């Protein structure tokens, strides 16, 4: 996405070192190089310490860990406590773009967004038949192409 929109800054945040390393390697290998990508090794629990109130336009949550066990629901990136943090850093009119291939996580997330009073402007349960305009497929999608993905804005 960064190469298609050089006027937009993209900041990736990940708690696992291996994932950040892989993202940094892939970013460094981009041809032509991109100057609008930064990566943060950190926990989203502390996102309000990194971004100012109203600083972020869009948050992309792509294929995050579904934490399938009910007792781990509070770890899901769409859990209501995280949604409060996102709301704090998002600009007025900002949005979250959430993509997953896990239906249970999608349904949980949809309920959390609704519970927290978020306006949902687009939902699809089939990314392969209803691609999102301006959206870029990620390699994880190709690896799991046999599964149906879901998207929420």
Regions found by a protein language model. Give the residues of each.
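Short beta-strand element of Class I
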Residues: 9-10
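Conserved SAM/SAH-binding beta-strand->alpha-helix loop
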Residues: 16
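Conserved SAM-binding loop
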Residues: 23
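S-adenosyl-L-methionine
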Residues: 27-53
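Conserved Class I S-adenosyl-L-methionine
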Residues: 83-84, 107-126
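Conserved small/polar residues in nucleotide/adenosyl-binding loops
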Residues: 141-148
């Amino acid at each position: 996405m960064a190469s298609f929109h050089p006027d937009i800054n993209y900041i990736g945040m990940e708690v696992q070192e291996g994932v950040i390393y892989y993202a940094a390697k892939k970013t460094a290998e981009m041809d032509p190089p991109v100057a609008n990508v930064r990566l943060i090794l950190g926990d989203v629990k502390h996102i309000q310490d990194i971004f100012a109130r109203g600083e972020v336009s869009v948050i992309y949550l792509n294929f995050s860990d579904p934490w399938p066990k009910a007792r781990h629901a509070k770890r899901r990136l769409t859990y209501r406590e995280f949604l409060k943090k996102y709301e704090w850093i998002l600009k007025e009119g900002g949005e979250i773009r959430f993509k997953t291939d896990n239906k249970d996580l999608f349904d949980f997330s949809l309920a959390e967004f609704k519970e927290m009073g978020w306006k949902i402007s687009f939902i699809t349960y089939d990314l392969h038949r209803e691609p999102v305009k301006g959206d870029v497929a990620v390699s994880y999608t190709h690896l799991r192409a046999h599964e149906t993905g879901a998207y929420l804005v």
